């Protein structure tokens, strides 16, 4: 079985980035969508992700930051509650400045748990700012898994899939991420599904029981490239030996 650990990093405040930021990236959007969508809604896609995943009968993990530039985590409270009620998972998207300080990570975890009212067991550091001392800190704080590790920005091979246990924490390398596909690997929209097919084949050749970790950022769904998400789900759910899971369900199988 090829297990897909499907997740979304919520990088921007609930109100979206500053208008200047959006205008500078106008060409990332179809002109009609850009013209007919309020700037603050161009990056807002959590409800649409939920709708799509519900349609395909799957669930994923949403990693929320606790430090948003000119915004607050509490602005996402309604989204977080909706996700939890629908059996999606909430994980911590740790601030890069916190990774060397266990107390800062603890404070972030507790801040997120004050909204979820349930323990947070999954972590991913913003910008994948991983270091070798991180797992032991996460273990002490009650995390079960981390998904911050990536060896290369421009290639996908066996090193970028599977899982390992480091200092008592399950580590999932990042296999496929929208930003790396488009920016570092130069994959265009037409090449996205073929790249997923190729990655699944690498996984099948690597191991009969394997994990492929996918990040599709919450803000890209209306963008060129990012809008292929529905087609990605269509392809993945058509494969008999592929199962899509949030991190919390995946670790139960791997334990």
What are these regions, as identified by a protein language model?
Residues 1-82:
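Active-site beta->alpha N-cap acidic-glycine motif
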Residues 7, 91, 244:
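Generic enzyme active-site microenvironment
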Residues 42-49, 74-77, 105-106, 190-200, ...:
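Well-ordered, non-membrane alpha-helical segments in soluble/globular domains
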Residues 56, 86, 141, 206, ...:
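Helix C-cap/helix->beta junction micro-motif
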């Amino acid at each position: 079985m090829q297990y897909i650990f499907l997740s979304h990093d919520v990088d921007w405040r609930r109100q979206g980035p500053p208008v200047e930021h959006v205008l500078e990236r106008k060409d990332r959007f179809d002109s009609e969508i850009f013209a007919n969508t309020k700037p603050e809604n161009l990056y807002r896609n959590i409800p649409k992700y939920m709708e799509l995943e519900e349609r395909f009968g799957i669930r994923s993990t949403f990693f929320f930051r606790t430090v948003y530039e000119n915004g607050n985590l509490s602005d996402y409270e309604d989204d977080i509650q909706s996700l939890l009620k629908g059996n999606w998972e909430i994980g911590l998207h740790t601030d890069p400045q916190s990774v060397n300080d266990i107390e800062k990570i603890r404070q972030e975890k507790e801040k997120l748990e004050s909204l979820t009212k349930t323990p947070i067991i999954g972590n991913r550091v913003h910008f994948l700012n991983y270091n070798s001392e991180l797992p032991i800190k996460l273990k002490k704080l009650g995390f079960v898994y981390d998904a911050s590790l990536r060896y290369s920005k421009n290639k996908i091979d066996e090193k970028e899939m599977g899982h390992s246990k480091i200092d008592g924490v399950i580590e999932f390398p990042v296999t496929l991420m929208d930003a790396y596909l488009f920016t570092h690997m130069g994959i265009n929209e037409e090449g996205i599904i073929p790249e997923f097919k190729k990655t699944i084949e690498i996984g099948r050749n690597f191991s009969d029981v394997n994990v492929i970790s996918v990040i599709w950022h919450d803000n890209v769904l209306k963008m060129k490239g990012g809008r292929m998400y529905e087609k990605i789900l269509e392809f993945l759910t058509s494969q008999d030996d592929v199962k899509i899971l949030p991190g919390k369900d995946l670790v139960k199988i791997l334990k």
